[in-house]
Amino acid sequence: MSPDTVGAVTDRVGPVRSASSRRQADWAPVNTAPSVPAVEPAVAEPVGELIVDWYDGAARDLPWRAPGTDPWAVLVSEVMLQQTPVARVEPVWRAWLARWPTPAALAAASPAEVIRAWGKLGYPRRALRLREAAIAITERHAGVVPADVDELESLPGIGTYTARAVACFGHGQRQPVVDTNVRRVVARLVHGRGEAAAARAADLADIAALAPQDDARAVRFSVAVMELGALVCVAGTPRCGTCPVADRCAWRLSGYPAADGPARRVQKFAGTDRQVRGRLLDVLRAAAEPVEPAALAQAWDDAVQRSRCLDSLLVDGLVVQTDDDRFSLPE
């Protein structure tokens, strides 16, 4: 139940892929950051409770957060929310589950069907990886999404963040779930930094220490702190006046010190290979039969860039070339 990171969004103590309304893709913790003080539980728990109380009154009405949402629906939402805003995900998520309500149903679909249904969510390799995960769930787990984090992480395309998110939000387990939004909240609230450093193993310990002692409240806290980062503790201009823990925020209390290092560059889209790949896939999605190279040439004028992007789509398994040198989605 990943909210978007307010603009890309991603993965389990035991990585929600962007633009502030996007989720960071799954990440692997790195241990190069300097050590930071542990969160004191006596101080941390009231903070966690305050965040849950705030969430109970401020949460967005997102369908994958509804009580009783099954783990498969949660898994689909988490994969879609990586790198894609909530507003674009919701209609596709609903249509996807109406068409493929179980892992077995998706496992039986063709790659072409899956790519077409993915539409314009972006990063379409996620669609193929989700299908591969559905096949693995069907073959290894009798069609039931596993609850164990390690088993989840062994599925194709499922990283640490997604595995913990499914275990927590889909199976109701007490699991620290850390995405870009959560790391930013912890960086400011606990460590007094305006921006989060690179993902690190200590992030999981930080968020676990902040969680309420009650297991059910801890599960709710995991989504509540994401929502706080998505709606209030945002990357650009945080809305500290509406923050439920502003009076305990180390960054605010220290006078909002500026982040170290160069400002982050805004990622452009126009003219990138991502845009070209999308244009080529649009042509193939709309075609009932394999298309001639000339049809793809109409989608993008730059022949060198077009050829490079077409090659990358072939390598990624998103496009196939026929014996007569036409192109189509994989069947």
Regions of interest found by a model, annotated:
Residues 300-314:
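Short amphipathic alpha-helical interaction segments
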